């Protein structure tokens, strides 16, 4: 079965967002994005 692109995109965004929330609540100080990611033009 195939998953529509928009659903996949939404799922990935949610996973990344909840990963950031979890890290914050657990007291981890990791950066959300690397320096290379901040400098990249999307």
UniProtKB/Swiss-Prot annotation:
Gene Ontology CC terms, in alphabetical order: periplasmic space
EC category name: lyase
Enzyme Commission code: 4.2.2.n1
Record bears the keyword Acetylation: no
Keywords: Cell wall biogenesis/degradation, Lyase, Periplasm
Gene3D superfamilies tied to this protein: 1.10.530.10
InterPro entries linked to this entry: Lysozyme-like_dom_sf (IPR023346)
Subcellular localization(s) per the UniProt record: Periplasm
Keyword Nucleotide-binding: no
Protein role: Murein-degrading enzyme. Catalyzes the cleavage of the glycosidic bonds between N-acetylmuramic acid and N-acetylglucosamine residues in peptidoglycan. May play a role in recycling of muropeptides during cell elongation and/or cell division.
Similarity annotation: Belongs to the transglycosylase Slt family.
UniProt name for this protein: Soluble lytic murein transglycosylase
Species name: Enterobacter cloacae
